[in-house]
Structure formats: structure tokens, C-alpha cells
Design a protein with these regions (language model features):
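C-terminal "post-core" interaction segments
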Residues: 1-152
């Protein structure tokens, strides 16, 4: 997500593709909630650490200690134990047992769920529409490529 879109690879016949390949041209936002844990915690922390865009929703769960399945018991089962901890430049050790706070906190209520609404998603859409209004992403028009004479 952090790779910058630099331009397009424009084939003679075919559809232009992003350059570098698979880069995005536009604004980003992360949507998260209290059920986001483990790699979801780390994704949200990384998204904030890199300054890729706002985070909308609720604070993440806060469970990033990694486990290792090192020992096998005589009955064939395996035990796991805490083994790895995550430290971020900006957040330090604070993600474990706390989580990542959103930039814009939105509480989803049981009533909205019953009504079939997702208040966090609705707020995220509002934020992105406003950002697009303030910082539009213009469409690209490709002129004919220049004619290059053969070298002499």
C-alpha cells in the first residue's frame, strides 16, 4: 500500500497499467473495530505508522503476541506458548494489551445493526467523499505517443 504510483505502462495495443504494477492512485482509509486483533492490530498500527490515511472505527483488540507450537505431547496434541512480541517505532510496545486508537471513533450500536446499517462504514464513506471533494483524483487522458524515428 505504501508504494507510490508513478505513472502508467502504456502498451501499443491494450489497456494502460499502473507503474509500478499494482500501485494505487487515490486516497486510502483503514476501517477497524474492537474485533480486529493479531495481524489486524499490526495492519492498523502499520497503516498509522506509515501515515497512509485516516483510521475510522473503534480501538482494535490489542493482541499481537505471537505463539510458537514447539512441543508435541504423547497423545499427539501440541502446546503453544507466547514467543514473539511486536514493537513499532511510533507506538513502541503499546499495541499489545491495548490496541490501536482510530483517528475517527465511531460506535456501532445494536440498533443500527438491527436496522441493517453499519455506522462505521457510513462514516468512512463520508470521510472519503469529503476528501475526494477537497482533493479530487482527476482522470488521466493519454495523448498519442510521440513518433520516434529510427536512429541513423
Amino acid at each position: 500500500l505504501m508504494h507510490r504510483h508513478l505513472g502508467y505502462d502504456v502498451p501499443r495495443w491494450g489497456t494502460p497499467e499502473s507503474y509500478p504494477y499494482h500501485t494505487l492512485r487515490g486516497h486510502l482509509l483503514a476501517l477497524t473495530n474492537q474485533f480486529t486483533g493479531s495481524d489486524g492490530d499490526m495492519f492498523t498500527a502499520s497503516f498509522r505508522e506509515l501515515g497512509l490515511g485516516p483510521v475510522v472505527g473503534k480501538r482494535t483488540w490489542g493482541g499481537v503476541i505471537g505463539i510458537d507450537s514447539r512441543y508435541q505431547l504423547v497423545d499427539g496434541t501440541t502446546t503453544t506458548q507466547p514467543q514473539y512480541s511486536i514493537w513499532f517505532h511510533h507506538a513502541g510496545w503499546s499495541v499489545e494489551n491495548y490496541g490501536v486508537d482510530p483517528d475517527i471513533e465511531v460506535e456501532d450500536s445494536p440498533q443500527s445493526y438491527q436496522e441493517g446499517r453499519d455506522l462505521q462504514l457510513e462514516r468512512a464513506v463520508e470521510v472519503m467523499l469529503k476528501r475526494l471533494e477537497d482533493e479530487p483524483i482527476t482522470s488521466i487522458r493519454f495523448d498519442q505517443p510521440p513518433r520516434r524515428p529510427l536512429p541513423k
